[in-house]
Amino acid sequence: MEILSTIITSLALTTNPVPIVVDVQSATACIQDDCYPVLVGKNTPKGTYGLKLATTTEPHYKGSVLVFKEDTKGTYAIHRVWNGKPSERRNERLKGTVSDRLITNGCINVSDDTYAIFKSHRKVIIK
């Protein structure tokens, strides 16, 4: 399941006040004028959220995620591309068309390089 179920610890880091703006319809995330392809899904919750950098022991998340929402269904986060099901070819899809990038159960998947950029940001606006 793509929605995270276990978050272990929050991490305190230097923060960047500029929000990440995610457009679900175009499957992109932008910081000011710099935009990046993302994997999203029809269940990606829209709204404005604070981001909390958290460590996780869940497999396939590479140790940390940026949590933006938690509810009874689980935890929604921005994280590196989840490769728990290799048949989904998520790394390839990240480079594909918008329709290729609509695959997640609500989380926002990004490349390793994009995650490194996003990691210091503490606000996301999802449209």
Predicted regions and their residues:
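Classical Sec-dependent N-terminal signal peptides that target proteins to the secretory pathway
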Residues: 1-6
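Hydrophobic helical h-region of N-terminal Sec-dependent signal peptides
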Residues: 8-9, 13
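Gly/Pro-biased beta-strand-loop elements
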Residues: 15-88
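Exported/periplasmic cell-wall-interacting domains
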Residues: 55-127
